[in-house]
Amino acid sequence: MQILVYDNLDEKQKEEALKRPAISAKDEISKIVSSIIKEVQEKGDEALIEQALKFDKAEISKIKITQEEITQASKRLDKDLQEAILVAYENIKKFHEAQIPHEIALETTKGVKCEVLTRPIEKVGLYIPGGLAPLFSTVLMLAIPAKIAGCEKIVLASPAKINDAVLFCAKLCGVDEIYQMGGAGAIAALAYGTQSVLKVDKIFGPGNAFVTEAKRQVSSDINGAAIDMQAGPSEVLVIADDLANEKFVASDLLSQAEHGADSQVILVCLSQDFAKKASDEVQSQLELLPRKELASKSIANSRIIIAKDLNQALEISNLYAPEHLIIQTQNPRELLKGVKHAGSVFLGAYSPESMGDYASGTNHVLPTYGLTKTHSSLGLADFSKRMTVQELSKEGFLALGKSVEILAQNEHLDAHKNAVTFRLESLK
């Protein structure tokens, strides 16, 4: 890994050191995705069946998975894996149940009652990528909060042939319908509906550049669907002092690097000696990984930055605004106070990112590409919306009436003023 001393860099070099890999061929991807969406809108299920063969090399005759197929998948699944999934399920459920909002009701002025009520989004679509690493854990991260929030209809899409663990998790979480469809076409089907696919109000879940672009396009169409967030390549930043275990640090860096060639990992440490030990350990562990080729490409986009102290390390982290922030120092909770931007934070030597990815209870769907400066990790609130209520008695109306008349008049909104004036006159 490239090693840089932060204080030796000029402003432009510092900016380059924290630069993320460019998302390539964006215009080309946009055109392809537009074409795929149009096909699904025009041909419905037929387009999805054709796309399954073209993109996923899967011959299918239907889109919707039957209950029998789900039952058989659960029977085939390894019992140890089932038990591990249940452990994760319970922790994720506990953490998200704790996020159930309390309704707010107060009297702002005598006779003026104001409330905040929460209501679930009615129909949600969950997208689970396929490929060599089936992300069945993402089913838990999406479906559990959807169920707790009270969404009336929860549907799930994943490329054919859907992994048994994905089907097991979907059944466990109470998903209503499962569709074997993938990529941009799946996003289009969820946004607009087909003969077999329910049109949803909001789409959740990660995916490749085509899925991300499809989510962007359908969310900008008033007839499409809302989305959870715009996701970029996965990333981690690790802050480590000289007493950190370089083996632990390297394993945390590589656990993120193996996600994909466009993932990025950054280590911020305090000395050349630790930087060298960590870099050597990364190379040693990398050689043993089955996904070595993917992780190697990610490591090429990554670097080690040497900070003069932990305060500067925090400054670097806040500038980068990582998806995952791991702090392996002697007093990690002390540093937490200075963290401004991060999707999820992992404190101490025994809090690897893997715990949050699977079973600690927090959600692993996180903003990337610097969006943690303005966006939050996925939570229960994303599956619901708030509405406000006000109720004024005659006494409350009279208390505010004159002030509202003056405010409306000065904004030159006469109908607003009249709505108050007519009522005031009726009470004389």
From Swiss-Prot:
Tell me a Gene Ontology molecular-function term this record carries: zinc ion binding
Superkingdom to which the source organism belongs = Bacteria
Q: Which InterPro entries match?
A: Ald_DH/histidinol_DH, Histidinol_DH_CS, Histidinol_DH_monofunct, Hstdl_DH
- Give the record's keywords alphabetically: Amino-acid biosynthesis, Histidine biosynthesis, Metal-binding, NAD, Oxidoreductase, Zinc
Indicate the segments annotated as coiled coil, or none if absent: none
Pfam families per record = Histidinol_dh
What cofactor is this protein dependent on?
A: Zn(2+)
The record's listing under CDD domains reads:
Histidinol_dh
GO CC annotation terms, alphabetical: cytosol
Catalysed reactions, as listed in the record: L-histidinol + 2 NAD(+) + H2O = L-histidine + 2 NADH + 3 H(+)
At the top of the EC hierarchy, this enzyme's class is: oxidoreductase
Pathway involvement of the protein, from the record: Amino-acid biosynthesis; L-histidine biosynthesis; L-histidine from 5-phospho-alpha-D-ribose 1-diphosphate: step 9/9
Give its E.C. classification number.
Answer: 1.1.1.23
The biological processes this protein is annotated with in GO are: L-histidine biosynthetic process
Q: Which residues form the active site?
A: 323 (proton acceptor), 324 (proton acceptor)
Keyword NAD among UniProt keywords: yes
How many cofactor units bind, and how?
Binds 1 zinc ion per subunit.
Where on this chain does Zn(2+) bind? Answer: 256, 259, 357, 416
* Annotated positions binding substrate: 234, 256, 259, 324, 357, 411, 416
Q: Which HAMAP family match?
A: HisD (MF_01024)
Q: What does this protein do?
A: Catalyzes the sequential NAD-dependent oxidations of L-histidinol to L-histidinaldehyde and then to L-histidine.
Q: Which NCBIfam families does its entry note? A: hisD (TIGR00069)
- PANTHER family tied to this protein: HISTIDINE BIOSYNTHESIS TRIFUNCTIONAL PROTEIN (PTHR21256:SF2), HISTIDINOL DEHYDROGENASE HDH (PTHR21256)
Q: What's the family?
A: Belongs to the histidinol dehydrogenase family.
- Name by which UniProt lists this protein: Histidinol dehydrogenase
Q: Which organism is it from?
A: Campylobacter jejuni (strain RM1221)
Annotated gene: hisD
